[in-house]
């Protein structure tokens, strides 16, 4: 997949291969892995994974665990029935599993995940009813969501997190900080990098990049009063795994929207070199690969 989890996984795979390990990657039909077949909409994800494990006979299975990537179902009546489409894989797999957790939330942040989704068929009433339903299912399932994480750390199952925040919420996990490094070396001159994106050379630039989702705070950027001498440069990418349909237009003279979608590692690195600062207006976050990328580029 494109985006943060995909890049994190690719960097890990490349590092393991550099150490002489044989690595097989399982992804969805659009990915470039060795096997495919998993998706948020496939209720048989566990069967797909168990079949591959039987065929490959690995020493260790590593799962990039972002719940929505495998299909998460919050039961509105019985929280014990809340699950993802890979729970039975964890129950039945006899090979040791290492899970990298990408999401865990405090109760306040968990409830902030509920965002209004416009209902074209029933209008404002439909939007309100859907919001009420989502609030109820989130309120009912906060503990069951956390238990999905906790159940994945047992005697032959280990968990990895990349921030102290996640480590506190997922007890028993091992903290390994999220790595990052520039994809262009040596560093490019800032003005030279800006010319490649047709960005102003005499103003300070605050950079905001990431998925076009409501919890990333793009609406905050649209309302910002940008100080003189500064521009906020935005580059969003489509979220293929959510239902949100957000406007990607920023009616703010202090905001420059590149509107280039997903960037290659090289182009993303060049974009970081354009910036004087990184802006993260997140409303909800468990961790931020963008933040680590920014640190790697001296921001």
What are these regions (language model features)?
Residues 1-10, 69-77, 216:
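A short, glycine/small-residue-rich beta-strand->loop->alpha-helix junction that serves as a flexible
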Residues 1-32, 56, 91-95, 149-154, ...:
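N-terminal subdomain of nucleotide-sugar transferases
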Residues 52-81, 96-100:
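Short N-terminal targeting/anchoring amphipathic segment
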Residues 128-188:
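Donor nucleotide-sugar binding/catalytic pocket of nucleotide-sugar-dependent glycosyltransferases
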Residues 185-199:
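A short helix/loop element that forms part of the nucleotide-sugar donor recognition site in Leloir-type
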Residues 200-216, 222-227, 233-235:
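Conserved donor-binding/catalytic core segment of Leloir-type glycosyltransferases
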Residues 234-236, 243-269:
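Nucleotide-activated donor-binding/catalytic signature segment of Leloir-type glycosyltransferases, i.e.
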Residues 270-286, 296-299:
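Acidic donor-binding loop of glycosyltransferase active sites
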């Amino acid at each position: 997949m494109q985006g943060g989890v995909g890049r994190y996984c690719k960097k890990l795979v490349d590092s393991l291969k550099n150490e002489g390990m044989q690595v097989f990657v399982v992804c969805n039909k659009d990915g470039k892995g060795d096997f495919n077949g998993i998706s948020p909409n496939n209720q048989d994800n566990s069967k797909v994974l168990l079949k591959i494990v039987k065929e490959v006979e690995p020493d260790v299975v590593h799962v990039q665990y972002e719940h929505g990537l495998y299909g998460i179902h919050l039961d509105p009546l019985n929280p014990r029935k809340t699950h993802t489409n890979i729970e039975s894989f964890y129950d039945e797999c006899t090979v040791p599993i290492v899970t990298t957790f990408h999401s865990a939330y405090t109760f306040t942040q968990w409830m902030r995940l509920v965002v209004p989704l416009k209902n074209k068929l029933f209008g404002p009433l439909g939007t309100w009813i859907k919001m009420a339903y989502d609030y109820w299912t989130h309120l009912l399932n906060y503990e069951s969501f956390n238990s999905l994480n906790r159940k994945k750390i047992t005697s032959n199952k280990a968990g990895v997190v990349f921030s102290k925040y996640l480590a506190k919420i997922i007890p028993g996990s091992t903290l390994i900080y999220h790595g990052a490094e520039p994809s262009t070396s040596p560093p490019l001159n800032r003005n030279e990098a800006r010319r490649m994106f047709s960005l102003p050379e005499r103003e300070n630039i605050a950079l905001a990049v990431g998925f076009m989702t409501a919890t990333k705070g793009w609406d905050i950027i649209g309302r910002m009063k940008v100080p003189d001498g500064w521009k906020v440069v935005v580059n969003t990418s489509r979220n293929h795994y959510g239902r949100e349909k957000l406007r990607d237009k920023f009616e703010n003279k202090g905001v420059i929207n590149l509107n280039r979608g997903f960037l290659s590692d090289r182009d993303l690195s060049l974009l970081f070199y354009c910036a004087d600062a990184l802006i993260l207006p997140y409303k909800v976050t468990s961790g931020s690969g963008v933040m680590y990328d920014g640190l790697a580029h001296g921001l």
